[in-house]
């Protein structure tokens, strides 16, 4: 039985939760407010979920996302809001930084595959909000990748929908979808959500349509 997208509580820009990042949260909230960005984040966020950030069209997405994470100051440790990266990112001079902000390497050559690796990680963690860009690239593609959906289904966790809205200078993470197993219906609901909020990435022409390959 499919649950429809449920709008969630909007959190004011820069609102902090106690004991998360301390002064860093305050500084990041001030910085985002200073440059005119607003942040709307689901509250409470599910303990375990796949967080989709769309569209991913620019290198600026990472910086804006990172400042959002710090500014909002949700009550979880940095490793509980995480993202996956190719193994090479965690071997060079930036390895420590990527780990510090919640990144972890994924073995793309593993016989088990990406989805089983992530499902296993979800099962092992008491708290895990896994952030993923559904396109998997900043370049235009005629589809989004299905990995975010398959991970959510395999791990039995909801999908939290987030958007980078560069023209209006806002980050919106304010809807939750429980996968029904009917991929076409769920993708249509996701596409409708993004059309409704009218988000545009840094380069809107590079945003992928909500279809799987």
Walk through the language-model features, giving the residues of each.
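Soluble catalytic domains of membrane acyltransferases
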Residues: 14-17, 34-196, 210-212
């Amino acid at each position: 039985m499919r649950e429809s997208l449920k709008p969630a509580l909007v959190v004011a820009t820069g609102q902090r939760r106690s004991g998360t990042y301390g002064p860093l949260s305050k500084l990041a909230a001030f910085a985002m407010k200073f440059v005119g960005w607003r942040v709307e984040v689901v509250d409470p966020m599910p303990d375990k979920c796949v967080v989709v950030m769309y569209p991913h069209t620019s290198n600026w997405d990472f910086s804006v996302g990172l400042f959002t994470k710090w500014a909002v100051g949700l009550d979880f440790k940095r490793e509980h809001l995480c993202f996956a990266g190719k193994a090479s990112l965690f071997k060079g001079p930036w390895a420590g930084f990527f780990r510090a902000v919640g990144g972890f390497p994924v073995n793309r050559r593993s016989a088990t595959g990406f989805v089983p690796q992530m499902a296993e990680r979800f099962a092992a963690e008491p708290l895990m909000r896994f952030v993923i860009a559904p396109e998997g690239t900043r370049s235009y593609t005629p589809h989004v990748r299905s990995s975010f959906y398959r991970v959510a289904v395999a791990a039995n966790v909801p999908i939290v929908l987030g958007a980078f809205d560069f023209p209006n200078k806002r980050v919106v993470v304010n809807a939750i979808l429980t996968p029904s197993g009917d991929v076409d219906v769920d993708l249509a609901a996701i596409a409708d959500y993004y059309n409704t909020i009218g988000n545009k990435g840094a380069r809107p022409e590079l945003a992928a349509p909500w279809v799987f390959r």
